Amino acid sequence: MASETVQLYNCGGPEWSRLRQVLMMLRLRMRPVEADQYGLTLQQLLEQQEARIPVEEEFHDPMLVFCGLSSAKLEQLLTAMRRASLPPIPLKAILTTTNRDWTSQQLWQELRREHEAMMQQRGGKK
């Protein structure tokens, strides 16, 4: 079984120290992903390949990818994140057989589309 890992995008500044503390408290591995790695697939990142494959369009939104977490551990993490009063991180995903071959850029684009669609739905219901 793969080690429980959270891939971190744009979560490196001091405002994210509480997130790192939560991850350490839960004994989860952290894998910061740099912009020049956005062209690697999520699986390649999980395997800790160090190649650099930049993309044309970088993104700056914070994003998390949960890899190898059980449902219980994921729920524990999300609860701890809410209690830690972290800055909002609307872009979150679980590594799946479908998205593991996507690049970070592709995942970001898909999560942005989904997030925007959800926000439009919420706005339409009010």
Q: PLM features: residue spans?
A:
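Generic signal for short, ordered secondary-structure residues
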Residues: 1-2, 56, 60, 86, ...
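Short C-terminal domain-edge/linker segments immediately following a structured domain
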Residues: 36-42, 62-63, 94-99, 123-125
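N-terminal, charge-rich interaction modules
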Residues: 1-47, 122
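Helix-rich interaction surfaces within compact, conserved domain-sized segments
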Residues: 6, 17-18, 28-31, 74, ...
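Homeobox/homeodomain signature
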Residues: 20, 32-35, 54, 59, ...
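Short, structured motif recognition centered on aromatic/hydrophobic residues
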Residues: 3-8, 60-66, 77
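Short, intrinsically disordered low-complexity segments
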Residues: 38-65
